Each structure stands twice: as structure tokens, then as C-alpha cells.
């Protein structure tokens, strides 16, 4: 794949990569980390600069094994508030229902965290970089054109 950036850009991505990941949120950064760890040449492109504002994030216990596999459990714990369940409240607040993760989920995964999304995303993004992904911030991808040679990416920085 050959990323071709806008001529007015001040920074260019690697001229060739195995995988281009567009979007430096949780999914994109996680995928970039895993692929870079496998030795793939990865370029991770994010239209903003981290840390950046996003709504959320309420993590679930099923996320914990992934954080462990990435080697990020302690970093996520450091930026998060422990959460052992969820409470559902009716619109008029007449009914409440609390569910403990250990009772409703896998009892080996009794908790997760509530995190500030900007911090969470930055931890994952910087981890992808530490795993070997080339990261490009402030880069808006406008077009990806595929041909027999691979793909050309047009972006603005």
C-alpha cells in the first residue's frame, strides 16, 4: 500500500506499508498494535491530535483479557475508576436495577473501569506507536484508491 499525502502536507507517512489503519480510536489503535506486534508495517492515521475529546467510556469485563493481552491492564487501571456492575434506572426514576458483573457475566471477570475517553484513546494510540506502528496525527484521509499495485491514499495534514 502506498500512502500519497496532500502535497501541502508538512509530514509524510511511510511510502509503503502492509496495513494502513484509518482512525486512532480504540478499535484502530488496538488493531494497529496487534498487527505491528506481528511484524507488519503499519501506519495508523488519526484526523485529530491525542488527547482529543470523545464521549465515554464505560468498559466491560470482557475488555479486561484484551488489555492483559496488549500488556495494558495496569495502564488502564491507572486512568480508570473500578466498576463492579451497572445500574439501570427508569426514565421517571421509579425503578432501579443493579447488576453485579460477577453475577451476570463471567465470575472470573468481576470488574472493569470507567475511564475518560481522551485518556483511554491516548493510552491505546501511544501503545500502537510503541509496538512499532508509524502514527500520523492531524491527518484527514480524503480518498483511498485501489489498483493492481495496491492502494493510494490522499490525505490532508
Residue ranges and their predicted role:
Residues 11-25, 43:
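Beta1/beta-strand and adjacent pyrophosphate-binding region of the FAD-binding site
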Residues 52-93:
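N-terminal FAD cofactor-binding segment of flavoenzymes
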Residues 28-29:
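N-terminal Rossmann-fold NAD(P) dinucleotide-binding loop
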Residues 1-13:
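Basic/polar N-terminal segments that are highly enriched at the extreme N-terminus
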Residues 40, 72, 133:
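Short phosphate-binding/catalytic loops that engage adenosine nucleotides
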Residues 16, 90-157:
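Conserved N-terminal helical subregion
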Residues 36-55:
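Glycine-rich FAD pyrophosphate-binding loop
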Amino acid at each position: 500500500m502506498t500512502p500519497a499525502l496532500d502535497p501541502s502536507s508538512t509530514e509524510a507517512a511511510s511510502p509503503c506499508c502492509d496495513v494502513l489503519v484509518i482512525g486512532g480510536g480504540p478499535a484502530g489503535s488496538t488493531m494497529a498494535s496487534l498487527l505491528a506486534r506481528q511484524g507488519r508495517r503499519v501506519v495508523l492515521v488519526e484526523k485529530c491530535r491525542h488527547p482529543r475529546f470523545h464521549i465515554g467510556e464505560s468498559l466491560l469485563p470482557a475488555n479486561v483479557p484484551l488489555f492483559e493481552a496488549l500488556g495494558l491492564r495496569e495502564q488502564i487501571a491507572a486512568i480508570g475508576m473500578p466498576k463492579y456492575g451497572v445500574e439501570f434506572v427508569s426514565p421517571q426514576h421509579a425503578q432501579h436495577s443493579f447488576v453485579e458483573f460477577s453475577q451476570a457475566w463471567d465470575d472470573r471477570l468481576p470488574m472493569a473501569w470507567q475511564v475518560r475517553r481522551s485518556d483511554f484513546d491516548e493510552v491505546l494510540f501511544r501503545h500502537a506507536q510503541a509496538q512499532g506502528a508509524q502514527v500520523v496525527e492531524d491527518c484527514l484521509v480524503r480518498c483511498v484508491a485501489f489498483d493492481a499495485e495496491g492502494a493510494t491514499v490522499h490525505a490532508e495534514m
